[in-house]
Curated annotation (Swiss-Prot):
GO biological process, one term: translation
Superkingdom of origin: Bacteria
Protein name (database record): Large ribosomal subunit protein uL3
Organism encoding this protein: Mycolicibacterium smegmatis (strain ATCC 700084 / mc(2)155)
One cellular-component annotation, GO: cytosolic large ribosomal subunit
Entry keyword set: Ribonucleoprotein, Ribosomal protein, RNA-binding, rRNA-binding
PROSITE patterns found in the cross-reference section: RIBOSOMAL_L3 (PS00474)
Primary gene name: rplC
Subunit description: Part of the 50S ribosomal subunit. Forms a cluster with proteins L14 and L19.
Length: 217
């Protein structure tokens, strides 16, 4: 089955009850409506993909080259544009320019991967950023309690290895959480209730796609 996807907005978390009256924590995602603005084919572009546009924006804020792309597709300008890769040419036939996608492309019980931008934490130490345990609180430890410790040898190798976990900026990265279950699809309001937490802040842009490792239930 071809992977499906849609752009949306993370609204926040809440909790609902399932059929067994157990509390289920869910993230509310405003999914779509998206509009198809371009279709990529292997023959013409070297790969298969569909370009989706989402979100309202004033036409005054759209630069002319981008406005021309929307005009060529025959749709009003949108705030966000993203390409979703398709598995093969057969999946391309399911889309056409100007087509509108809503939350109904998913069903209750489907499994999805959600991609978003994680919350930025600023400059963080190794204990917060990488989970280091720190150093002793007593036995002569002085002003080193949250330090990482050694970052390499002196003469051998005489340098710090690339990729060594150290302090630095944390968060504000593209993160994907896989195999989340769609608890409920509210087609009337264009909302997905996804079990568990997803990356990013409330109001942030997210991409919801069919789970690549599990697929639909």
């Amino acid at each position: 089955m071809a992977r499906k996807g849609i752009l949306g907005t993370k609204l926040g978390m809440t909790q609902v009850f399932d059929e067994n009256n157990k509390v289920v924590p869910v993230t509310v995602v405003k999914a779509g409506p998206n509009v198809v603005t371009r279709i990529r084919t292997t023959e013409r572009d070297g790969y298969s993909a569909v370009q989706l546009a989402y979100g309202e924006i004033s036409p005054r804020k759209v630069i002319k080259p981008v406005a021309g792309q929307f005009a060529a597709a025959g749709v009003n300008p949108r705030r966000h544009v993203a390409e979703l890769r398709l598995d093969d040419e057969a999946a391309v036939a399911e889309y056409e320019v100007g087509q509108e996608l809503t939350a109904e492309i998913f069903s209750d019980g489907a499994y999805v991967d959600v991609t978003g931008t994680s919350k930025g934490k600023g400059f963080a130490g190794t204990m917060k950023r990488h989970g280091f345990r720190g150093q002793g609180a007593a036995h002569g430890a002085q002003a080193v309690h949250r330090r990482p410790g050694s970052i390499g040898g002196c003469a051998t190798p005489g340098r710090v290895f690339k990729g060594t976990r150290m302090s630095g900026r944390m968060g504000n990265d593209r993160v994907t959480t896989q195999n989340l279950k769609v608890h409920k699809v509210d087609a009337e309001n264009g909302v997905l209730l996804i079990k568990g937490a997803i990356p990013g802040r409330n109001g942030g842009l997210v991409v919801v796609r069919s789970a690549i490792k599990r697929g639909e239930k």
